[in-house]
Every structure is written in C-alpha cells, then in structure tokens.
Regions:
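Thiol-based oxidoreductase modules, predominantly thioredoxin-like and allied folds used
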Residues: 44-63, 72
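Short Fe-S-cluster ligation motifs
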Residues: 63-74, 111-112
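Non-catalytic, surface beta->alpha helical segment in thiol-disulfide oxidoreductase systems
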Residues: 79-111
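N-terminal leader/targeting and pre-domain segments
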Residues: 1-21, 111-112
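Local sequence-structure signature of Cys/Sec-based thiol-disulfide redox active-site neighborhoods
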Residues: 11-49
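Structural motif corresponding to alpha-helix initiation and N-cap regions
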Residues: 4-8, 58-62, 96
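Mobile acidic interaction elements
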Residues: 37, 41-45, 59, 83-84, ...
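Structured beta-strand/turn binding interfaces of compact recognition modules in eukaryotic regulators
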Residues: 23-25, 56-58, 80
Length: 113
C-alpha cells in the first residue's frame, strides 16, 4: 500500500505527541491479538506511560503504519518518534534490559531503573 499524505500526517501526529507510542490491535486493557497483548504488557511492566492506536479501528492506519515503518506486522513500538520494532524485538529487548536502558537514555521515566 502507498502511504497517502493524510495518513502519514496522522501517524506523525500520534508518535509526535507521545514519547512512547504503540500501534496495536485492540487497546492496552483489551488487546485483540496475542502479540499486541504481549507488547502492551511489556510496556506496563516497565511502568512507562504510552499512547496507543487501535489499528483495527482505521484501515488506513493499519496499512499505512506498515508502509511508514517498512515493517510488515503489528504491533509497532515508537520511542521519541523512532521505530523500535514489533513484539519479538520488544521481548528480546525487555529480557536483555535494553528496553529499560533505551527508555533511560531517552529520558523516559520508568518504574524500573
């Protein structure tokens, strides 16, 4: 799918207004897929505040975010407007301590130091 300007602007607005942002299926309280559930649980465990977008509510965002990041799957994590990765990368980074380190180096408050 080609990324139209309106969708690109909407994506950039969402990730620009939140230091940590997760594109997911469902929402943090009611994820609609296992990968989105794991991704939001990781962020909750880290104790970071994060924005989110339920891509199931908007086809243009669901397809557009894949074109924007050049990444084929959802969920997708952005930190300070930078694409970090999906569920598997988040799991690896959380287990190794890299995710907390990334939050700390970017000045994002966590409940884990």
């Amino acid at each position: 799918m080609e990324l139209d300007n309106t969708t690109k602007e909407n994506i950039e607005k969402m990730i620009g207004e939140n230091d940590v942002f997760l594109f997911m299926k469902g929402n943090p309280d009611f994820p609609m897929c296992g990968f989105s559930s794991v991704a939001s649980a990781i962020l909750k465990k880290c104790g970071v505040e994060f924005g989110h977008c339920n891509v199931l509510d908007d086809e243009s965002i669901r397809e557009g975010i894949k074109a924007y990041s050049n990444w084929p799957t959802i969920p997708q994590l952005y930190i300070k407007k930078e694409f970090v990765g999906g569920c598997d990368i988040m799991k690896e980074m959380a287990e190794s301590g890299e995710l907390i380190e990334l939050f700390n180096t970017r000045g994002i408050k966590t409940e884990i130091s």
